[in-house]
């Protein structure tokens, strides 16, 4: 194929004209057009739409510059009139009584002929034109490109709202457009003459009046040697237009090569193509598309990757591969415009927010140099090109999860950082304020150690991405770990075989601060670890290490859920892309695990209640949210009564409801000392009910011995001993001060190690040697010597850092990851995680010490 066969590509974009005060579609295109010079702007059927026409060019970056220039000119003129252009398939706020048809004989006749179809043409599209040698070749190209058109539609989907309501479709424009008698899938034509004859017959029939009214999804131009792509919605993001233009040109190139080689296009399956188009309009980029080859549904992202592979040779020939691959990654990372619009609406339920989002994305111009950056991959990944403002002074000292050692943004974060860069510091600061206000309104608060009042739980704006391969490894390793700890707890409160066999020293168990007599009350068949929270960190090499096991009352899952909701609400431009594990099903998974903790005596559907210490509890928000989401009671000790070993709670002071499972969200010592509904301590009656197998407690009493910091050092041995397996995950190297040799090593290296009291909770009592003052090291040395069995030492792990928005700039802050495992019949790793982030300059991420969290994206495999 000669390059002359594909001379250029051009784009026509249609823009709705909105009133910036009401965000309503207004019929003022004629007024706008009178202020615009040149042939690049023109009217459309309705007076509320302006069309722009780019110059044809062989260079996609030049095309991008041209489109941006046209958008700027249109935005400037409309802005002077209090108006704004909106590039989207539809807009949400429309008053049909205000709208009218453009003053043009052709348009007026179309309205007379087609009536409501013409009057409701409240849609805008983006059309791509690719030059070909002649119209016969153009007709042959149509058949070759047809199977990929639904994918291009999905990329463009930007019209979820229609006449003020969510249509349920990603591209409602497609359904409106297909009401025209000649819209949709093109037929099969061997030559341009056959096609022209069809057009002549349609005109003769009176159904259309001219060749320009043939609205096939792809067609030869009526007056130029080009192939026109007409299926796509208008796109707010100009880079989506460039992506579609580049892919379509590559498809045309590929088709011409096949035709010149004597190939025949696969016979079109019009019914399947129509079904595929409908599915793309329904689902957009976030759902499944139809595999035209007949293999069934396929995720849109997988279809996009297949298309990129298909046309890579053509993209490379035009030096477009790096650009298009980058833009495809960006499109997937941001999600479709339809998806972003729905998130904007979900935030406050206001259609004006949707309109504002589309207006902003249409007029926003990327920073200077962005065009060059987009076209210069692999240098495109350099941080000074991806996010020059936000990362200008960002200097991590160790392993950073977003910026690598060369200062380049890691590939999986490019789309995220581009979006944050486009928003800029001012908007990000505003969103922090919005976030805090929303948290206060919804009661998403936490009380840190030493605080007299609750405050908004710190949620950072920059999301964290866990690679799918990493998540697979973590899932396997954490399930293994919880199975071993479950076996250990049963053993320790039973025959203590691990002690007898020398796996765990007897003193480790006997001296454990959390060893409880009540732990023996739990039956041998009971599940002891219903909910585990395992903390992990990434070391200096980026590898994962288990830092701590939490088997008593691990908190955080509700904050992970609310973090996602807040992120989608406060930063709808960013939001998690399609293909990220959703969090909707977490309450159901938790309820399922809690039901499995019910005693055998429970009849029917076991009744579950969340047991909280009350509104003064630091994590009361989580307790109440989980109870609400699971549809179960939230009770305090004062609500509970143990009657003949049955546990009940009071409703309205008189009615009683049985409880089969108490999801314990308070320390067991506090629970045992708390007064029940009878006005007496609840501990002994509750213990009798547990022994009688009339109530299940999740997590079980006495579980604290399993997350003892000394016991942590022996978990790898437990995995081998109880399961006969090798540990999948590594631990932080740990020294037990109860062992004289190990204690000597700790004392000799206090200034290099992290030392922890075995009963420390939430980071309290931890001394980080390299950062500690000399007097603190002297203090801790004396405490270790006085009671060595109550201390451990660990190698200092250089925690990975993650960019965190703090005081109007990004800071590299230490992060860990809390992953939750729910144990019903088998341990199940919850498809969510809480990324906890330390304050700047600190290594302690615990919320009780002022730490916060980040939305965590886990891709589906």
Swiss-Prot record:
Enzyme's top EC category: ligase
Region called Carboxylate-amine ligase, residue ranges: 1-372
Reactions the enzyme catalyzes: L-cysteine + L-glutamate + ATP = gamma-L-glutamyl-L-cysteine + ADP + phosphate + H(+)
Keyword annotations of the record: ATP-binding, Ligase, Nucleotide-binding
GO BP annotations, alphabetical order: modified amino acid biosynthetic process
One function term, GO molecular function aspect: glutamate-cysteine ligase activity
Chain segments carrying region Unknown: 373-861
Pfam families: CP_ATPgrasp_2 (PF14403), GCS2 (PF04107)
InterPro entries attached to this UniProt entry: ATP-dep_Glu-Cys_Ligase-2, CP_ATPgrasp_2, GCS2, Gln_synth/guanido_kin_cat_dom, YbdK
Recorded superkingdom: Bacteria
Gene3D superfamilies in alphabetical order: 3.30.1490.270, 3.30.590.20, 3.40.50.11290
Record EC number: 6.3.2.2
Function: ATP-dependent carboxylate-amine ligase which exhibits weak glutamate--cysteine ligase activity.
Family: In the N-terminal section; belongs to the glutamate--cysteine ligase type 2 family. YbdK subfamily.
PANTHER family reported for this sequence: BLR5612 PROTEIN, SLL1039 PROTEIN
Alphabetized HAMAP family for the sequence: Glu_cys_ligase_2
UniProt protein name: Putative glutamate--cysteine ligase 2-2
Provenance organism: Frankia casuarinae (strain DSM 45818 / CECT 9043 / HFP020203 / CcI3)
């Amino acid at each position: 194929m000669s390059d002359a066969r594909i001379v250029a590509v051009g784009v026509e974009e249609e823009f709705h004209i909105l009133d910036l005060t009401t965000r309503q579609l207004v019929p003022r295109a004629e007024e706008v057009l009178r202020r615009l010079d040149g042939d690049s702007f023109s009217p459309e059927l309705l007076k509320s739409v302006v069309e722009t026409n780019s110059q044809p060019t062989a260079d996609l970056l030049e095309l991008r510059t041209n489109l941006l220039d046209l958008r700027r000119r249109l935005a400037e003129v409309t802005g002077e009139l209090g108006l704004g252009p909106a590039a989207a398939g539809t807009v949400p706020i429309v008053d049909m009584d205000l709208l009218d048809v453009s003053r043009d004989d052709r348009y007026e006749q179309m309205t007379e002929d087609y009536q409501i179809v013409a009057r409701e043409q409240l849609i805008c599209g983006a059309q791509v034109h690719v030059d070909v040698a002649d119209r016969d070749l153009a007709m042959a190209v149509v058949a070759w490109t047809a199977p990929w058109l639904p994918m291009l539609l999905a990329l463009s989907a930007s019209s979820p709202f229609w006449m003020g309501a969510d249509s349920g479709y990603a591209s409602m424009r497609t359904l409106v457009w297909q009401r025209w008698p000649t819209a949709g899938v093109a037929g099969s034509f061997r030559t341009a003459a056959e096609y022209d004859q069809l057009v002549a017959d349609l005109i003769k029939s009176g159904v259309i009046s001219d060749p320009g009214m043939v609205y096939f999804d792809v067609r030869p131009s009526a007056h130029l040697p080009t192939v026109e792509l007409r299926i796509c919605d208008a796109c707010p993001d100009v880079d989506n237009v460039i992506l579609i233009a580049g892919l379509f040109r590559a498809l045309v190139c590929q088709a011409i090569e096949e035709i010149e080689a004597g190939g025949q296009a696969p016979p079109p399956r019009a019914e399947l193509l129509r079904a595929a188009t409908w599915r793309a309009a329904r689902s957009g980029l976030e759902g499944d598309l139809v595999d035209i080859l007949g293999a069934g549904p396929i995720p849109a992202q997988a279809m996009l990757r297949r298309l990129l592979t298909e046309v890579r040779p053509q993209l490379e020939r035009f030096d477009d591969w790096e650009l298009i691959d980058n833009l495809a990654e960006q499109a997937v990372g941001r999600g479709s415009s339809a998806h972003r619009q729905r998130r904007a609406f979900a935030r406050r339920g206001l259609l004006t927010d949707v309109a504002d989002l589309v207006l902003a994305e249409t007029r926003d111009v990327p920073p200077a140099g962005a065009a060059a950056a987009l076209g210069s991959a692999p240098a495109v990944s350099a941080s000074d090109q991806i996010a020059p403002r936000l990362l200008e002074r960002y200097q991590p000292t160790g392993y950073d999860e977003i910026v690598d050692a060369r200062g380049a943004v890691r590939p999986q974060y490019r789309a995220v950082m581009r979006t944050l860069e486009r928003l800029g510091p001012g908007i990000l600061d505003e969103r922090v304020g919005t976030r805090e206000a929303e948290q206060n309104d919804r009661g998403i608060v936490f009380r840190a150690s030493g605080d007299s009042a609750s405050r908004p739980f710190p949620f950072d704006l920059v999301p964290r991405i866990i690679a799918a391969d990493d998540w697979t490894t973590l899932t396997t390793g954490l399930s293994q770990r919880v199975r071993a700890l479950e076996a250990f707890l049963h053993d320790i409160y039973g025959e203590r075989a691990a002690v007898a066999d020398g796996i765990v020293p007897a003193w480790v168990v006997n001296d454990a601060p959390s060893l409880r007599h009540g732990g023996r009350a739990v039956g041998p068949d009971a599940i002891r670890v219903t909910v585990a929270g395992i903390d992990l960190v990434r070391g200096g090499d980026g590898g994962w290490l288990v830092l701590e096991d939490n088997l008593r009352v691990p908190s955080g899952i509700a904050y992970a859920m609310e973090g996602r909701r807040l992120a989608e609400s406060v930063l709808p431009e960013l939001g998690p892309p399609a293909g990220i594990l959703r969090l909707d099903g977490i309450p159901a998974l938790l309820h399922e695990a809690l039901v499995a903790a019910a005693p055998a005596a429970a009849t029917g559907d076991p009744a579950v209640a969340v047991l909280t210490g009350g509104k003064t509890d630091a994590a009361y928000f989580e307790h109440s949210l989980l109870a609400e989401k699971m549809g179960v009671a939230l009770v305090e000790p004062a609500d509970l009564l143990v009657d003949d070993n049955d546990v009940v709670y009071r409703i309205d002071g008189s009615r009683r409801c049985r409880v089969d499972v108490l999801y314990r969200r308070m320390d067991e010592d506090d629970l045992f000392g708390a007064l029940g509904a009878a006005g007496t301590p609840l501990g002994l009656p509750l213990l009798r009910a547990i022994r009688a197998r009339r109530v299940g407690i999740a997590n079980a009493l006495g579980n604290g011995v399993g997350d003892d910091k000394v016991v942590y050092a022996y978990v790898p041995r437990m995995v081998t001993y109880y399961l006969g397996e090798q540990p999948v995950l590594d631990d932080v190297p740990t020294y037990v001060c109860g062992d004289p040799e190990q204690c000597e090593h700790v004392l000799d290296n206090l200034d290099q190690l992290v030392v922890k009291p075995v009963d420390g909770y939430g980071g309290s009592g931890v001394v980080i040697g390299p950062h500690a003052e000399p007097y603190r090291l002297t203090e801790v040395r004396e405490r270790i010597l006085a009671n060595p069995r109550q201390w451990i030492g660990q190698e200092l792990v250089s925690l990975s850092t993650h960019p965190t928005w703090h005081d109007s700039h990004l800071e590299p802050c230490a992060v860990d990851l809390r992953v939750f495992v729910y144990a019903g019949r088998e341990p199940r790793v919850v498809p969510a995680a809480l990324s906890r982030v330390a304050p700047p300059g600190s290594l302690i991420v615990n919320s009780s010490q002022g730490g916060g969290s980040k939305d965590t994206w886990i891709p589906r495999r």
